[in-house]
Every structure is written in structure tokens, then in C-alpha cells.
Amino acid sequence: MKTLLDVHTHTIASGHAYSSLQEMTMAAKEKGLEILGITEHGPHIPGTCDPIYFRNLHCVPRQLYGIRLMLGAELNILNTQGDIDLDEDYWRMLDIRIAGIHSLCWQGGTREENTQGVINAMLNPFVQIISHPGDGTAELDFEALMKVSKETHTLLEINNHSMAPIRHKTVAAPNNLELLELAKKYKTPVIFGSDAHFSTMIADYSNIMPLVEKAEFPEELVLNYQPEKFMAYLKPTPEK
């Protein structure tokens, strides 16, 4: 099936990415996408944008070059309590809200404590996707996460960039294979994320596809192929 969306990407606003918003959107158009998510890093990542960046996102059109833009953030899960950065006022300004563990701003603990921290973030009604849970930054109980994913409609991401050889994350591929096998077992949708930091990386899932084949993962559980199903599955922004 054809990939029609990628909702985990970064522009120069994140401080360590190298393409503009317009360059990213044009690349998405060239690749035939319908939906592009641009999710700049939350404020605990050094060098990322100031919170005022998110406050002013209303200036950007949500249809550009024929692409639906979803402008949001990759928020940071900060600790084993599941606290994330920014706050509710900002979360409400975002079209899409991803949360993930990053070593630069994560205070972890045991496997059980780490898992509970991610689960607490998943129980946050604003968090729609957990980014790169399989990258090995924190030891996690993937089966426990998958059960909560199914219960809460908080998608677990299969992250392409974390498996790039240059990243030297040796556990990422086996961890992501386990996530796919569990998603298949529990019939739970997943989302593929390029985690693109440059325009040519958009919708690059080349490190994911061998795992998909190995797991014999059903296409109907991959929301990147089904934009309408993806939009319907996402947690809505809670009412005030």
C-alpha cells in the first residue's frame, strides 16, 4: 500500500534540523503525501524553538501545496511520573501532540518505573502518539504499553530514524520488531514515523519495512496508509 502521511518531522525551528517548513511541505507533495505533521521539539531539548513559536502557529495555513499540515510538537516525557513539557494552554494550540523520551531531559528509573512513566503520559488526554518507544533510551515493558495503547488510542510509533546505522542504537530494530509483533497480537494500530530532520527523509520508512515483512504485519494496522482512519483514530483535543 502507498504511504500517504508522515506526522513526525522537524524543521529548522527545532534547532538541529535543516529544512524549512515550506521545503518540508514541498518534499511531502513530491512524495505524494496527503498529510504532513511538523512536530518541533519541546522546550527541554537544547536549541529548540521558544514556546512563543507554538503560540503563533495560527499564522501558518493548514493547507499548503495541496498538503494538509498538522502543526504540533514532540513533547518530552521528563520523568517516571509521566510529566511532559509545555502546559495545557500550549497543548490546546497544537494540531498534533507527540510525547517521547529523550536522553537529554529524561530522569529515568527501573524498567517498571520507566514503563509507568510512559503509561502516565499515555493517559494524558492530550498525548496522541508516543515517539520512538523502541529506541532503547529507557528500558520499557512493551506489552504493557501496547495494552494501554489499545485502551486509550494513544499510538505507539515505529520510528525509522532510530534504526539508522549512524545512530548506533543496536536495540532499536529488535525492540521495534517486538512492538510490531505485539501490535499484531493485540490487533492494535501503529504509526510509522520518519523523524525527518531534513526534507529528503520525509516518509522514509526503509528501516521499518524489513521488520514489517519479518513480522508479517497486517497492512490494515498501519495508519500511514489510511489518512481518514488515522484522523478518526486520533484522540480529539479535550473540551475545556
Regions found by a protein language model. Give the residues of each.
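Histidine/acidic-residue-rich catalytic or RNA/ligand-binding cores of hydrolases
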Residues: G15-Y18, T48-P51, E139-M146, I166-L180, ...
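Alpha-helical scaffold segments that flank or form the walls of functional sites
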Residues: Q22-L36, N56-Q63
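Short acidic/polar active-site loop segments enriched in Thr and Asp
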Residues: E34-I35, T39, Q128
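Short acidic/histidine-rich active-site segments
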Residues: H41, T188-I202
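Extended substrate/RNA-proximal surfaces in nucleic-acid metabolism proteins
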Residues: G42, G47-I158, E213-V222, K229-K240
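His/Asp/Glu-enriched short active-site or ligand-binding loop at hydrolase and phosphoryl-transfer sites
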Residues: L155-H168
